[in-house]
């Protein structure tokens, strides 16, 4: 069944790019009733999907025109994470109805896979895909799980240390890791059994929030409590840690771009931060809006996207 949609053309109010060094920054305001973007996912065609969490919708932005389309996800929806899958469709961790959701990119038909009975409200967070096309996901209330879209079979496991599973990522080699904010660890998942192997970061109670893999399969972690960005090298079993600039940084999101440069959001600085691992240097891009609250970062070659949930807009950082 086709869902009703709302479309807005915002080309007249798109903010022009602002240049800073080799980066051009451009903001895209979102329409009334379709703001509070939580996560973003960039499609292969360069358009951007985002979760409008407070209105229970999935947004779709065309950066070339500023047009925003809003797709309702149903009564009670409160979408959190979104990722474009290997099928080209946006997949969503839909926390409001405790389900994994797919939106057909052509028809806009919404399909949902509810969590099995007995697991309660999971506070679903983030998802990723393995090399077999299966969806792996986290729930902050203490679970992680796996969905086989072909059959609808879903497995859910209790996380070690209970509450906390947050960000999740797939490495180029196909391994899957997640971070636990409340548990202060990362874990590698066995793709056959679902078992989680805990890996302890060197800083105690660091608050590992989100994770991303670089081209070499190393795991980058944003540490919310400690204000660090850390890197775990699975081949060596070794950690490296860097503190973000400022007195009391709060590292929320982390994303590694196609050149293995690391991007983070720092809530204390109200900024997006770029980290060059080779030079071990940081560059800070403060938002021009107060309390922008970037909760996630994602991108494609040459550009990084930041959803500013506190400013109701999406911001692109493009390499010039």
Where are the regions that the model predicts?
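A short loop-to-beta-strand structural motif that recurs across blades of beta-propeller domains
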Residues: 57-60, 98-102, 142-146, 185-188, ...
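Conserved beta-strand positions in repeat-built beta-propeller and related beta-rich domains
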Residues: 48-54, 90-97, 135-141, 177-182, ...
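Beta-propeller fold detector
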Residues: 26-29, 69-73, 111-115, 155-159, ...
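Beta-rich, blade/repeat-based domains predominating
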Residues: 33-45, 75-87, 118-132, 161-173, ...
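Short loop/turn segments that connect beta-strands within beta-propeller blades
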Residues: 62-66, 104-108, 148-152, 190-194, ...
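A short helix->beta-strand "capping" segment at the edge of beta-propeller domains
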Residues: 21-34
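Bacterial N-terminal signal peptides
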Residues: 7-15
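Loop/turn-rich, solvent-exposed surfaces of beta-rich toroidal or solenoidal domains
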Residues: 224, 247-274
């Amino acid at each position: 069944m086709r869902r009703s949609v709302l479309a807005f053309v915002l080309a007249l109010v798109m903010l022009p790019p602002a240049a800073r060094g080799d980066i051009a920054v451009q903001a895209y305001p979102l329409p009334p009733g379709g703001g509070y973007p939580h996560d973003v996912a960039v499609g292969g065609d360069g358009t951007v999907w985002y979760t409008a969490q407070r209105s229970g919708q999935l947004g779709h932005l065309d950066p070339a025109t500023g047009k925003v389309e809003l797709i309702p996800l149903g009564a009670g929806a409160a979408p959190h994470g979104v990722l474009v899958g290997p099928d080209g469709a946006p997949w969503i961790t839909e926390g409001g109805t405790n389900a994994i959701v797919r939106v057909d990119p052509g028809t806009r038909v919404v399909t949902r896979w509810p969590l099995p009975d007995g697991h309660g409200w999971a506070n679903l967070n983030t998802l990723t895909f393995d090399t077999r096309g299966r969806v792996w996901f986290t729930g902050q209330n203490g679970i992680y799980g796996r969905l086989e879209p072909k059959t609808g079979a879903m497995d859910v496991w209790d996380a070690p240390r209970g509450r906390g599973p947050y960000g999740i990522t797939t490495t180029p080699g196909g391994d899957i890791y997640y971070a636990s904010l409340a548990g202060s660890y990362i874990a590698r998942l066995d793709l056959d059994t679902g078992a989680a192997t805990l890996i302890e970061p060197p800083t105690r109670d660091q608050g590992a929030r989100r994770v991303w893999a670089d081209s070499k399969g190393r795991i980058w972690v944003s540490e919310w409590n400690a204000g660090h960005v850390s890197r775990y090298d699975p081949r060596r079993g070794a950690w490296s840690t860097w503190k973000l600039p400022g007195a009391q940084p709060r590292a929320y999101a982390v994303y590694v771009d196609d050149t293995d440069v690391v991007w983070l959001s720092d809530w204390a600085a109200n900024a997006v931060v770029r980290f060059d691992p080779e030079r071990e240097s940081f560059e800070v891009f403060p938002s021009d809006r107060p309390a922008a609250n970037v909760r996630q970062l994602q991108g494609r070659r040459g550009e990084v996207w930041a959803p500013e949930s506190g400013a109701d807009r999406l911001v692109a950082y493009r390499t010039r």
